[in-house]
């Protein structure tokens, strides 16, 4: 297999991640590679094959399969990282704004937007009642996790979080979602998870 090949680049990077025991991140790259190879229909993918048109078609392919935009973003960011590494060592050509027209951000899917002041009050108002405090913490986490639905929050399992990455399947569509856990969510996550019984498979206590 040619060294100037995207597949080689990903596999090499996955090996480095595993050596550093970053297994969850390595799996994320493995999933992105498997998906992109399936789309391309080939085992070898020269870096020259990756252009704006290919990326746009890949994005359309993912969306047509029912993938959420945040999942599309994760795949695109994985491809972008490997491509940029190849550019640095001269294995791939530098193409300005190569990923400009594909989604690489984080989308918050709130069907009805709250006024910013109302949102601030919901998230920061002092609460003394334990049940209300739990509800407030859940709301904050749903917001910080890119607008996660409560049913998905309730069904999160303990093994869904590894190395700062949250991976779960949406209850509604079955789509795989992967998001990096923001620093401001960690305290809330630990606080809410502390109420879960040790033998429960779920991360939070809502289904107990």
List the predicted regions and their residue ranges.
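Conserved tyrosine-mediated DNA breakage-rejoining catalytic core shared by Y-recombinases
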Residues: 155-191
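Short linear capping/connector segments at secondary-structure termini
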Residues: 98-105, 171, 204-208
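Conserved helix-loop functional segments at active or binding sites
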Residues: 61-64, 88, 121-128, 159, ...
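Short, leucine-enriched amphipathic alpha-helices that occur as contiguous helical runs
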Residues: 29, 75, 134-137
